[in-house]
């Protein structure tokens, strides 16, 4: 593969928050630690105060990997290294989308691995471990029960409740067979089919299935996969859980930050609640609310007095599940983390969280925008070249690109702006004459000019439509290029699964991403 890099704002596909982060806008400084570069990492390494229990972290990970038979030397080394004070993590997180979900799941992890490598080169006396934090406690099954591959939606049909990580994968067989059918029968297809089948077989839970699959894809590169739905890990977080439920500090802190962000035109991505924890059991994840002097679990008969709540948190910390605004704090309490790698939407809500980290005296990580990319096959590249279009052109909206193409290649003048300029000059003279004769007729003159302008605009559109018919073959090719690179009208990485790319490139696919992704350059990557 070869790579081209373009600025994010050239793609017209990213929010203003992303472009402002990439531009290192001063107004964002109160909401971050530092803007990410090698110098910032040097600073944060020296400043990071990690009070978590490293031994407990290592023990939990060893236990979580007990049923993973394929453990690379680098993976084992990284888990062991987490027990040492000179080891830090580079973390990304994601839900347990079936069959890995959209491409950006892969891109997130590749970014984390590459950044860990880059930091090791810069600071060889330290260890840097890439971490994938599985969102095993998330209960939004509708967000993770499907994936798109080759333009087809594959869905896992199940009436699911509770944490998705605890779901049994027995009923996924139909979706699995559909997915395998799209992969085909090539050698690479068979290899991936076998990998996926093993991941979800034997009635595993979804957390174990996802760990297996992510380890098969990334274990050789040292990726450590963390399932934080773990009693030992949660016990380290329980003092904050107790204090936050009772004092409702996160609600106050994050609400205040959201108001401040609104003054610089960054609007809240997440809304904190008075209590930002769920009550979690095998088939239940319900909000905790404070009502009538008691802590009530919604839609149940379960309730606690303040003293009962404290005792429950102490004895059963695993029952208390942080929501989207408290999960990042939990992550930073149990991991010796330096940076969180996320997409634009994720980093936007992290901007709301720094004040809460400061309140609880937990170090806030550097926020690193994940690598975004598009993979173009040879046929698509060929079509672009034949039409003399660049990859940057491909990001122009379809109709605008078609119009641009026609204007560049037509032998006729389709733009009537010169004619309108001439007519406008005539009308300006006419208005002066009318003004001298009867000023009350000036609006009528203006109305005639407006009608004529509309008529010229309409004629210009008709000329363009007529000329487009003369370029129908090229314009149809533009449609095909756009559909290939932007499935469903959006970025490829946000929709298409990695499966068919693995079928095409095999075991070279991820190494090619590792080769070309540059985690601290903050450019959009086009691979072809």
Task: List PLM regions with ranges.
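Glycine-rich phosphate/pyrophosphate-binding loops
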Residues: 102-103, 116-140, 365
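A structural-propensity feature for long, helix-poor, extended segments
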Residues: 141-148, 375-407
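Long, compositionally biased intrinsically disordered regions
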Residues: 3, 213, 217-304, 308-311, ...
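A translation/RNA-centric and nucleic-acid-associated enzymatic feature enriched
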Residues: 268-269, 273-338, 344-355, 364-366, ...
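A glycine-rich helix N-cap at a beta->alpha junction
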Residues: 148-175
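N-terminal leader/transition segments
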Residues: 1-70, 93
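Short acidic, glycine/serine/threonine-rich loops at helix termini
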Residues: 103-104, 140-147, 236-241
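N-terminal catalytic cores of NTP/NDP-binding nucleotidyl/phosphoryl-transfer enzymes
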Residues: 85-120, 342
């Amino acid at each position: 593969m070869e790579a081209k890099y373009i600025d994010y704002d050239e793609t017209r596909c990213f929010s203003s928050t992303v472009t402002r982060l990439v531009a290192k806008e001063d107004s964002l400084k109160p909401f971050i630690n530092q803007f990410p570069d090698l110098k910032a990492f040097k600073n944060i390494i020296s400043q990071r105060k990690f009070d978590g229990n490293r031994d407990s972290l290592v023990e939990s990970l060893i236990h979580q990997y007990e049923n993973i038979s394929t453990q690379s030397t680098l993976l084992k080394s990284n888990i062991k290294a987490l027990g040492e004070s000179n080891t830090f993590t580079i973390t990304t997180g994601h839900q347990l989308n079936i069959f890995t979900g959209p491409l950006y799941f892969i891109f997130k992890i590749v970014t984390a691995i590459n950044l860990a490598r880059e930091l090791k080169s810069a600071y060889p006396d330290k260890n840097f471990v890439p971490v994938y934090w599985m969102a095993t406690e998330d209960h939004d099954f509708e967000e993770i029960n499907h994936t798109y591959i080759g333009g087809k939606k594959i869905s896992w049909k199940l009436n699911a409740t509770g944490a998705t990580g605890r779901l049994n994968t027995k009923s996924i067989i139909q979706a699995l067979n559909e997915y395998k059918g799209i992969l085909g029968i090539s050698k690479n297809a068979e290899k991936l089919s076998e990998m996926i089948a093993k991941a979800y077989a034997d009635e595993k839970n979804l957390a174990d299935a996802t760990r297996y699959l992510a380890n098969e894809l990334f274990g050789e590169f040292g990726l450590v996969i963390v399932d934080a739905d773990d009693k030992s890990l949660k016990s380290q977080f329980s003092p904050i859980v107790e204090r936050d439920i009772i004092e409702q500090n996160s609600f106050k802190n994050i609400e205040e930050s959201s108001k401040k962000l609104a003054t610089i035109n960054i609007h809240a991505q997440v809304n904190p609640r008075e209590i930002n924890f769920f009550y979690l059991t095998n088939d239940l994840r319900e909000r905790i609310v404070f009502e009538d002097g008691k802590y009530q679990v919604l839609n149940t008969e379960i309730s606690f007095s303040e003293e009962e709540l404290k005792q429950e948190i102490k004895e059963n910390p695993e029952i208390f599940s942080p929501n989207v605004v408290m999960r990042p704090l939990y992550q930073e309490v149990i991991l010796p983390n330096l940076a969180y790698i996320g997409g634009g939407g994720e980093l936007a809500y992290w901007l709301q969280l720094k004040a809460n980290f400061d309140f609880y005296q937990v170090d806030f990580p550097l926020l690193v925008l994940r690598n975004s990319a598009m993979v173009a096959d040879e046929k698509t590249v060929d079509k672009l070249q034949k039409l003399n279009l660049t990859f940057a052109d491909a990001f122009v909206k379809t109709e605008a690109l078609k119009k641009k193409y026609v204007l560049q290649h037509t032998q006729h003048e389709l733009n009537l702006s010169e004619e309108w300029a001439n007519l406008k000059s005539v009308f300006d003279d006419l208005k002066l004459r009318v003004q001298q004769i009867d000023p009350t007729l000036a609006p009528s003159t203006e109305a005639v000019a407006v009608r004529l302008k509309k008529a010229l605009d309409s004629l210009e559109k008709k000329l363009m439509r007529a000329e487009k018919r003369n370029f129908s073959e090229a314009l149809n090719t533009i449609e095909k290029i756009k559909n290939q690179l932007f499935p469903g009208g959006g970025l490829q990485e946000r929709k298409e699964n990695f499966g068919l790319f693995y079928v095409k490139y095999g075991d070279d696919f991820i190494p090619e991403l590792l080769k070309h992704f540059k985690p601290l350059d903050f450019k959009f990557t086009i691979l072809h």
